[in-house]
Amino acid sequence: MRLLWLTGALALALLIGVLSLQVPAPAGPHAPATAFSAERAMADVQELAQRPHPVGSADHARVQAWLQQRLTGLGLETTVQTGPISRGSARYLRRMGGDPEAANFTAANLVGVLPGRDPALPAVALMAHYDTVPMSAGAADDSAGVAAILETVRAIRARGPAERSLVVLLTDAEEIGLDGARVFWGGHPLRDRIGAVINLEARGGGGRAMMFETGRGNAETIALFGRAGVRADGGVTSNSLAVFVYERMPNGTDFTIPKNRGVQGLNLAFIGRPEQYHAHSAPEVLDRGALQHIGSQALENADALLRAGALPAPTVNSVYADLFGRVILRHPPAVGWGLLALAVALLGVAGWQAGRRAGLTFAEVGRGALDGLWFLAAGLVLTHAVRTLAGPMAARAGSAETYYTLLARLPWMEAGAALTVLALAMAVMGGRARPDRRISAGALAAAAVLALVLGGLSPIVIGAALVAIALSLFPGLAARSAWGGWTGLIALVLGLGAVTQLLAPEAAFLFLWPGLLAAAVAALAALLDPGLTRPAALAPVALAAAVGGGWLVGLSHPVFLGIGLDLPGALALIGLLVLMFIRPLSPERGAVRPWLMAALAVLVLGGAVSGWARVAEPVPAPAAAEAA
């Protein structure tokens, strides 16, 4: 009976997650004038992305002249701002095969202004870069962003005059060092008039456009984004965890420059189809649904800002996340403590009722928490080992060609890591105490050695391996009951939530929201049927697993695309949360051995899928790379 509930819940969770990751259908050329149309924008993409147009190239001059005409034709007051590129940028351009001398070591920004009814009000800027790397026509990066801005301007004009002025900033030399953005924000007369900026980027050729960066102190910005962005075709994909993580990464885009000046705003990008990044990125392979998604979000947010009574001001950072792309749920950071307290109280109700009627003990809850700790530690080790089968870590790539090939292998890496996490979940659900402890510990030690040899020294892998091996050598610590395993996992997740709430409250929702849902369902199930055998208790458990698991599946894909190249263990962390929902649906005792054998088969399949990436996406030979 439980196996049927488990299968149904997982199937529904996968369906919900996959549906939440879909891009909207591209609007056709005859869409309403006030709406964004990807097909209309594609005409600009096709003009821009005929060939690579890096700084200093003949095609760069062609694109620049054509964009000036387009901006003027849209009714914007258009000027060209020039400024020097840095020595470092010039050296980087040369290494990529470009010619900074042909550009006279100069970046040329295109600046267009659509005056508002009250030019004294702070203006809103739409920003994208029009240069490309020498080896790519850049249909996605960033012709899609430029074309989306042109179509957005057209639609805004069709909606009627706005109070605020709109500044269109098409920057140059972004690919070699953000030089164009530095030139504009470093001294253009308009820079101090701009109160909000929306930047459009791409690191791939498709997928949903994620809003992954804001100005600091973003509570008011997120409030506006939550109202305006959800009106966009396909809704929004964004959460404060992405903002928190990106803030601490070494990466930068043009948005970095105004952000560091204290300007509020939004940074949007799609990162699916990673094989197209700085590679073959022609108009015919660009995901038009991705263009519709990023453009529609740019339009709705820019229009809301232009017509707002006051622009968002920096306050505090908000804790927020989208729910299946359709609504933004947000709250102040301090509310996290209240959510944690409520979840602990509900877990207490579940534990008290299960202890009274099902014999649950504190020791069994502790064993359940150790089960979760073993899953997380083993997951970090095994996903890292499986990831290295697909190629070196990014820091050891050795060349640009190897790095871009690794990006192309991301789908294989993701599939391999996901299968690995699934195998571990099956092991926990089947009762990890059953396999020989020496075999389990030895397998984890071998995986750790593989990860360290192929991936390089990693303190995280070493620490996780020690924890996982130690817990494997003491199988008596594994949970023996469904209630012990379930409540222990909830307690572990809430403990992680408490630590995160203390150190990084913007990221704590990842633990607190699912933990609160799981605790509430556990309390309900304990009151309805402590034996966890009747549909009255199993139905809400399965429903929570489907909804909560579906949300986590939708979250896991952009997380892996963003950081999975170097941190594949992020899927193990998300897998722990899914495991928390499905743990009470563990199979009956008689199904343990086939369950564990199936887990081993899934683990082997995960390694094979990841390793196949080397065959499916080989590193191009140097001669082939030069010819490209």
Whereabouts are the PLM-identified features?
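Positively charged n-region of N-terminal signal peptides that target proteins for export
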Residues: 1-4, 589
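Hydrophobic membrane-insertion alpha-helices, especially the h-region
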Residues: 5-19, 597-608
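C-terminal region of N-terminal signal peptides and the immediate post-cleavage residues
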Residues: 17-27, 610-619
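Peri-membrane helix termini and adjoining interfacial loops of integral membrane proteins
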Residues: 18-21, 313-318, 390-396
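Soluble extramembrane regions of membrane proteins in the secretory/endomembrane system
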Residues: 23-330
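C-terminal domain-closing interface element
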Residues: 192-211, 336-359
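Cytosolic-side membrane-insertion boundary helix
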Residues: 313-343, 361-364, 408-410
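Alpha-helical transmembrane segments of integral membrane proteins
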Residues: 346-628
